[in-house]
């Protein structure tokens, strides 16, 4: 399928656009904060913080019953009427599926449901979506899935996929792909919180970085032993180090607990059905090592879930519920669905997020993806 070219499109242009929009949003937020503090008696401000319990009189008078200044006239509420809502995320699955989002070019589409024509407004950024679609290597790939997400609220800005065998399929929503080293994020959070480790904690391993043999899980020191910090082991994706974290520091219980906290083996709500990511942890210590470093094909996940896991770094450990449909309205413009930000779990403690962010930064600066990001450095 040919994708229309974007005139003078470039990654740097798009980044500059995002920065301008971010500065504009920051200015708006600043002005809202000023209004909030200068005019704290406004009903809107009081409603935001939950201080209204019925009337201003109950907050400011001397205990006497508040009097209506103009008896017989209804007071006008300052809060806007809530939009009419008929559907929740699960109900939307009945008339929207992954095919509607197969390389969507616009940020909306229309469908027929129960004799009604519905307009579905998505969170997709068309310019970013089209840019990424142009960059797909369809010739040399069997599957590609690219998900771009706003970590603040879980809005999916781009959902670009390619399946050579089934063009109508969207791999971004397919939960059958091996999680591989993405699971090291889960293991790292568990090690920092339950393994009593720090970023500069020294860890040892023998053999190669990207293998995982049972002999590499033994605690031994000789002239071939390598010493590495937790931070560098993460950045360079050292399998035997993370295998040891699984067997010697965490074990089955902690691995299961943190896997669940990061969204594995649970249903994550999205407006289109998203099968749960899977991991099965047995009683075998070597299997704990395989799970902890992602050296297996049994731990599976979708690209959308991968983006959610990365977003915890920016949300102080919160796993945010994703959303791709902002609203659904009927022919008359009446809202039938409105997305709302929601938290799935607290994957790790807020104070751990700074260390997790440093792990990700080190991976970009000196780790396995250094070459990929080199040309984008300022």
Q: Residue ranges of each PLM-predicted region?
A:
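Beta-lactam-recognizing serine transpeptidase/beta-lactamase-like catalytic domain environment
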Residues: 3-7, 99-102, 146-169, 195-378
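Gly/Ser-rich catalytic serine loop of serine hydrolases
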Residues: 174-183, 298
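Short amphipathic alpha-helical face segments that pack within enzyme cores
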Residues: 181-190, 303-308
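Extracytoplasmic/periplasmic proteins that interact with beta-lactams or build/remodel peptidoglycan
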Residues: 2-145, 166, 339
């Amino acid at each position: 399928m040919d994708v229309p070219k974007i005139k003078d499109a470039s990654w740097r242009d798009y980044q500059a656009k995002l920065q301008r929009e971010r500065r504009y949003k920051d200015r708006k937020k600043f002005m809202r904060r000023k209004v909030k503090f200068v005019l704290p008696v406004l009903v809107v401000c009081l409603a935001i913080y939950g201080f209204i319990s019925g009337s201003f009189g109950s907050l400011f008078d001397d205990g006497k019953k508040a009097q209506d200044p103009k008896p017989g006239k209804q007071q006008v509420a300052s809060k806007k009427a809530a939009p009419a809502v008929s559907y929740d995320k699960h109900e939307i699955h009945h008339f929207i599926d992954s095919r509607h989002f197969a390389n969507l070019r616009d940020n909306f589409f229309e469908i027929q449901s129960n004799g009604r024509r519905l307009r579905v407004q998505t969170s997709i950024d068309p310019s970013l979506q089209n840019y990424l679609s142009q960059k797909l290597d369809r010739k040399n790939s069997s599957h590609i899935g690219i998900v771009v997400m706003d970590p603040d609220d879980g809005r999916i800005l781009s959902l670009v996929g390619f399946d050579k065998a089934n063009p109508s399929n969207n791999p971004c929503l397919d939960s059958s792909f091996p999680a591989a080293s993405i699971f090291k994020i889960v293991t790292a959070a568990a090690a920092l919180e339950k393994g009593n480790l720090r970023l500069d904690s020294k860890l040892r391993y023998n053999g190669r970085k990207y293998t995982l043999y049972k002999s590499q899980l033994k605690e031994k020191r000789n002239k071939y032993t390598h010493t590495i910090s937790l931070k560098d082991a993460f950045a360079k994706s050292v399998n035997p180090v993370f295998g040891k974290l699984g067997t010697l520091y965490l074990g089955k219980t902690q691995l299961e607990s943190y896997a669940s906290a990061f969204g594995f083996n649970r249903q994550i709500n999205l407006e289109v059905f998203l099968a749960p990511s899977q991991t099965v942890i047995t009683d075998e210590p070597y299997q704990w090592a395989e799970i902890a470093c992602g050296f297996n094909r049994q731990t599976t996940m979708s690209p959308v879930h991968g983006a959610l896991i990365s977003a915890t770094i920016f949300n102080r450990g919160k796993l945010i519920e994703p959303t791709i449909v902002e609203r659904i309205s009927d022919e008359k413009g009446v809202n039938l669905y409105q997305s709302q930000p929601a938290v799935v779990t607290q994957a790790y403690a807020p104070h751990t997020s700074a260390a997790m962010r440093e792990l990700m930064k080190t991976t970009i600066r000196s780790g396995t993806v250094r070459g990929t990001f080199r040309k984008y450095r300022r």
